[in-house]
Amino acid sequence: MRSYGYTDGWAGDGSGRCRCSSDSIRRYRSRISGPLLDRIDLHVEVPRLPPQALRSGNLGEDSASMRARVVAARQRQLARAGAPNAHLDQAQTDDHCRLEGDDQVLLERAIEHLQLSARSMHRILRVARTIADLDGSAAIATRHLTEAIGYRKLDRAIGTASAA
């Protein structure tokens, strides 16, 4: 699902094209329902790249390397649970997405601060497990969990809008 940050489509562009007031942005974002957001695993903002970045030739990981990491991660998931992380039920998520003490506290604080549902919490855990798999890690590390929490960007935007 794609969503523009607000009505004119220039969210976060930095070009000065956006003329929306903060109230109109807040109203626009509040139209997205919480139950719908709960069902989206990754909320990612993809900014427009300047032409210089496109010409530099340094665009990150190449497709072949990325594909190899994805294939290896999927094999780990199938070997561990017999299914991809996205298809784990609650009991499987609890079993295969365990966190250490400090990370459990971090997740609980994020859930409270962002006012997330149990469904969102389980999605965060499955995404963190997937990030760990892509990293070749047997356990979910703090960096995997914080990255997964970071992908709840729309929850933060809506939470901020409803708090104002």
Question: Where would I find each of the regions flagged by the language model?
Answer:
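Basic, amphipathic alpha-helical bundle interface domains used for macromolecular binding and assembly
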Residues: 1-164
